[in-house]
Amino acid sequence: MNLAMLHDNVLVEALEDSNPNSPIQLPDSAKKKPTKGKVVSVGPGASNSDGKVTPMSVKVGDCVYYRQWAGNEIEFDGKKFIVMKESDIIAKEA
């Protein structure tokens, strides 16, 4: 991945919670936005009032859960990602 995040931004690839074998298929407009994803890129962290960088608590490869309407969707190299602030991440799998 050649997309470097700045500050306390995190690039996440959403993981769909769909079951293609289910007899009930919802149209895209009726599906909930995913809230689970894999961290693909992480910025160095936010600067505090003293100018020191607060390190990030997530790293590339982490599986995270985030707020439903977190971040902004982008497309890079033909794939869709979500760029969000670290504070939009509410949990990570241990």
From Swiss-Prot:
Alphabetical UniProt keywords: Chaperone, Cytoplasm
Subcellular location: Cytoplasm
Pfam family, one: Cpn10
Keyword Chaperone in annotation: yes
GO molecular function, one term: metal ion binding
SMART domains the record matches: Cpn10
SS bonds (residue pairs): none
Gene Ontology process terms (BP): chaperone cofactor-dependent protein refolding
GO CC, one annotated term: cytoplasm
Positions of region (Disordered): 17-53
SUPFAM superfamilies named in the record: GroES-like
Similarity annotation: Belongs to the GroES chaperonin family.
Function: Together with the chaperonin GroEL, plays an essential role in assisting protein folding. The GroEL-GroES system forms a nano-cage that allows encapsulation of the non-native substrate proteins and provides a physical environment optimized to promote and accelerate protein folding. GroES binds to the apical surface of the GroEL ring, thereby capping the opening of the GroEL channel.
Subunit organization: Heptamer of 7 subunits arranged in a ring. Interacts with the chaperonin GroEL.
Protein name as catalogued: Co-chaperonin GroES
Lineage of origin: Bacteria, Pseudomonadati, Pseudomonadota, Alphaproteobacteria, Rickettsiales
